[in-house]
């Protein structure tokens, strides 16, 4: 009896937690130029932009954490894209980036401006354009 009661309480807690989760927001489809022209409008929002990979850098931190950064080039305008992990993209690939845009973000002593965080844990992704 006691085991069933405990199991019932655990089940209710799980259902309650699942009900509180919000679905991932639909990203705002925009352009690199629009992000650069009006960064306040998109700050901390999920965006989707298309462009070409330029200045690709795949690194591993001293702590062993892999990351990828590149410039997303579209119509002569560029914006930085960051993601944890080594992405399967190459220089000059045409890609679709979904991620959280930051007008300005501080990480430790560094400040990053006009950057998209496309990390999967942030709900982001980078995929090759079909």
List the predicted regions and their residue ranges.
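Positively charged n-region of N-terminal signal peptides that target proteins for export
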Residues: 1-5
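OB-fold and OB-like single-stranded nucleic-acid-recognition modules
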Residues: 19-130
């Amino acid at each position: 009896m006691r085991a069933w009661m405990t199991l019932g309480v655990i089940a209710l807690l799980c259902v309650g937690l699942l009900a509180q989760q919000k679905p991932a927001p639909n990203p705002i489809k925009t352009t690199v130029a629009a992000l650069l022209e009006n960064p306040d409008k998109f700050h901390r929002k999920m965006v989707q932009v298309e462009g070409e990979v330029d200045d690709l850098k795949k690194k591993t931190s001293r702590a062993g954490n892999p990351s990828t950064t590149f410039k997303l080039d579209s119509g002569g305008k560029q914006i930085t894209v960051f993601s944890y992990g080594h992405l399967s993209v190459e220089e000059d690939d045409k890609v679709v980036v979904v991620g959280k845009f930051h007008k300005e973000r501080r990480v430790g002593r560094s400040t990053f401006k006009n950057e998209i965080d496309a990390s999967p844990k942030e709900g982001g992704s980078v995929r090759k354009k079909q």
